A protein has these predicted regions:
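N-proximal low-complexity "stem/linker" segments adjacent to membrane-targeting elements
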Residues: 2-77
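Short acidic, gly/pro-rich beta-turn/loop elements at beta-sheet edges
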Residues: 61-63, 88-90, 138
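Surface-exposed, flexible loop/turn segments at secondary-structure boundaries
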Residues: 57-59, 86, 134-136
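Short beta-strand/loop segment that forms part of the nucleotide-sugar
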Residues: 75-86, 126-133
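Active-site-proximal specificity loops/subdomain of glycosyltransferases
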Residues: 29, 91-157
Length: 157
């Protein structure tokens, strides 16, 4: 999948049941969103894989690229962590436009805390993590690494 700019990179995971070590890690070190996702995605839903995407100042065209990529993947959870450093007080216009496009084009299935689950197509879902609005922003020195960790922790669930 072509990257929109240098702020977006993806990590692709095959999903399986968490091991005892993974469960211990999640209990001790996981980000809050990894615990919230249990209330956002129904237990009956199973994904074969997931794609973790941190996004800051991405063009709304990202949704189109994700939808095209999703056509070749079945039962995939796309985890989009829309983030912004805390030193920037107002939400980025690009982040707001991306979220507005998602809300306009996709059907929201579930919502819990700063997580919103959307149907991307018949076989795949998009989980949007809000780490860009006031109070949810990522500490400035942690940046994209923190966004990746949030997505990876969710993927491990």
């Amino acid at each position: 999948m072509p990257a929109g700019d240098s702020h977006t990179t993806g990590c692709y995971y095959n999903v399986s049941a968490p091991s005892a070590a993974t469960k211990k890690y999640l209990a001790l070190y996981a980000e809050a969103e990894a615990h919230y996702v249990v209330s956002c995605i129904p237990n009956a839903v199973h994904y074969d894989s997931c794609l973790c995407i941190p996004a800051f100042d991405e063009n709304a065209e990202l949704l189109t690229r994700l939808a095209l990529f999703a056509k070749s993947h079945l039962k995939c959870l796309f985890i989009l962590v829309i983030n912004q450093p805390a030193r920037i007080t107002a939400a980025s216009k690009a982040n707001l436009a991306l979220v507005a496009t998602i809300e306009k084009k996709l059907v929201k299935q579930q919502s819990h805390h700063n997580l919103n689950l959307y149907a991307l197509n018949d076989a795949n879902d998009l989980l949007v993590v809000d780490r860009y609005t006031q109070g949810n922003q990522i500490p400035s020195l942690q940046g994209v690494g923190q966004a990746r960790k949030i997505a990876a922790d969710i993927a491990l669930r």
